[in-house]
């Protein structure tokens, strides 16, 4: 395995003592992992939920997933030829964008590909994402799932939520006989439409969790060959 470039001094940005200690800890953990594992993969983790991270960590016992401020992770890798911790490692930083995690592992490339190509979780849609379905709340009594399941299997939405629906979510609701009601069907969004904050909150309120979350892996570094290779696992293709 190629020797590390340990002689380079890297200065982290000025910050408070606790924040600096945390940056130094992450920095040191990255470099220790680089000396321990054969591969390091760049995972794109924008909008990731805590349970997803827990699942991945539990599935990859024996490997190490590190997260932190992107600039700290990049500095630990080395952003230039002169600063890189190992030969050609600086080339990996060009694949670091948004919220990232570094997965260090001795598992084979095929194992990594198979796991992350198969891994998928349903999640609530975020603002600026595309609506997974056309969602319309039927007229009449407003039920907790907004018409997604038969009313015999559902329950009316709690009347205490009516001000939230009317004022925060701008739905034309009223209270009739103690029940939240709509005098006409209310269209929340159409499939493929770009969601605003209000629409995303309404979908969450009615339990619409149909957005698919997948981990994107853009590239990896091989410690033995000192090479960076592009992967593009789960990368969305441009329309």
Curated annotation (Swiss-Prot):
User: A GO molecular-function term, please?
Assistant: RNA binding
Q: What is its main location?
A: nucleus
Q: Which InterPro entries match?
A: Mrt4, Ribosomal_uL10, Ribosomal_uL10-like_insert, Ribosomal_uL10-like_insert_sf, Ribosomal_uL10-like_sf, Ribosome_Assembly_uL10
Q: Which GO terms describe its biological process?
A: nuclear-transcribed mRNA catabolic process; ribosomal large subunit assembly; ribosomal large subunit export from nucleus; rRNA processing
Q: Where in the cell is it found?
A: Nucleus, Nucleolus; Cytoplasm
A GO CC annotation recorded here is: small-subunit processome
Q: Which UniProt keywords apply?
A: Cytoplasm, Nucleus, Ribosome biogenesis
Q: Which SUPFAM superfamilies match?
A: Ribosomal protein L10-like (SSF160369)
Matching Gene3D superfamilies, A to Z? 3.30.70.1730, 3.90.105.20
Q: What is the superkingdom listed in this entry's lineage?
A: Eukaryota
Keyword Hydrolase listed: no
Carries keyword Cytoplasm?
Answer: yes
**Function noted in UniProt:** Component of the ribosome assembly machinery. Nuclear paralog of the ribosomal protein P0, it binds pre-60S subunits at an early stage of assembly in the nucleolus, and is replaced by P0 in cytoplasmic pre-60S subunits and mature 80S ribosomes.
Protein family (similarity comment): Belongs to the universal ribosomal protein uL10 family.
What is known about its subunit structure? Answer: Associates with the pre-60S ribosomal particle.
Record protein name field? Ribosome assembly factor mrt4
Organism lineage string:
Eukaryota, Fungi, Dikarya, Ascomycota, Saccharomycotina
